[in-house]
């Protein structure tokens, strides 16, 4: 029996088809591997975004000692025959903040925020026998580093988070008293200063806090952001620069300042 051999052209065509199929399979595997490898990066890329925030808020701080000292001064002047009015409380005031945030992944973000608040209250007495004007002020500039955790369970229309904060509180306080009494100079009454005192105090100290917040997306790249939390910032005794009738001195305050308290805010977030 004679065996029929395949022509040379058929053997070459068979090897060519086999090589082509192997190349196609290799290309498919490369595409699949690249897709699998790039999936985590694609998921990260949708969260790795910078954003800026701007907000206004309201704080309620533990400045009861300041209110009590102000009332004590009012009572003291009243005992001297100068019935000045009562001071308003300094415990509640608005604040303003701005910051940047970096969303690292689906669960974590870091932020750096600066905030400012200040409040001044006044009291006075204007009578035929004397005049007295009193001013008291408190305030603080804060720089805060926050680390936020976004739980996996959350509604589709908002992202809520829990955040720990570590910051630097740069506190300040001020006091001013200017008063004069009417005295006779011959047959004429003239005002004579009996008090002219001004003092400024400042101190910086680390603060810590815990807050909860939520971002509600309004449209692409633009969200409403809200937050509420508590800050620990016990400043204690402040060093004061005091001027009495033009004479300067450095003295510690007679009360402790506690800038701890509750803060709530609302603002806007812009994705970059």
Please name every model-derived segment:
Residues 44-103, 263-272:
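Short glycine/proline- and aromatic-enriched beta-strand/turn motifs that initiate or cap beta-hairpins
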Residues 91-95, 140-144, 205-209, 223, ...:
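Transmembrane beta-barrel architecture of outer-membrane proteins
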Residues 1-49:
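Cleavable N-terminal export/targeting peptides
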Residues 46-51, 58-60, 101-187, 218, ...:
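Gram-negative (and chloroplast) outer-membrane scaffold detector with strong preference
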Residues 64-87, 117-140, 170-204, 237-257:
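Flexible, solvent-exposed loop segments that connect beta-strands
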Residues 218-272:
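Predominantly the C-terminal beta-signal and adjacent terminal strand-loop region
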